[in-house]
Amino acid sequence: MAIERGAKVRILRKESYWYREVGTVASVDKSEKTIYPVTVRFEKVNYSGINTNNFGVSELEEVEA
């Protein structure tokens, strides 16, 4: 199952501020050369005041909305 824009996803990257948190996919880059093609938007901000981050498809788990 491919991850699409608007999907709810759980973050599996352990070093991420949002590890195990749920966010919404803001965009997906279809280019094969992109290492982190999925941009995810979160409700809360990190230490720098940022609420988006890019992740690889293998670092995400789609959850039921």
UniProtKB/Swiss-Prot annotation:
GO BP annotations, alphabetical order: photosynthesis
UniProt topology in membrane: Peripheral membrane protein
Pfam families per the UniProt record, alphabetical: PSI_PsaE (PF02427)
InterPro entries in UniProt: Elect_transpt_acc-like_dom_sf (IPR008990), PSI_PsaE (IPR003375)
Domain of life: Bacteria
Subcellular location per the Swiss-Prot or TrEMBL entry: Cell inner membrane
Main location: membrane
UniProt keyword annotations, A-Z: Cell inner membrane, Cell membrane, Membrane, Photosynthesis, Photosystem I
Cellular component aspect of the GO annotation: photosystem I reaction center; plasma membrane
Family in the record: Belongs to the PsaE family.
HAMAP family referenced in this protein's UniProt entry, alphabetically: PSI_PsaE
Protein role: Stabilizes the interaction between PsaC and the PSI core, assists the docking of the ferredoxin to PSI and interacts with ferredoxin-NADP oxidoreductase.
Subunit structure of this chain's protein: The G.violaceus PSI reaction center is composed of one copy each of PsaA,B,C,D,E,F,L,M and Z, and forms trimeric complexes.
Protein name according to UniProt: Photosystem I reaction center subunit IV
Gene: psaE
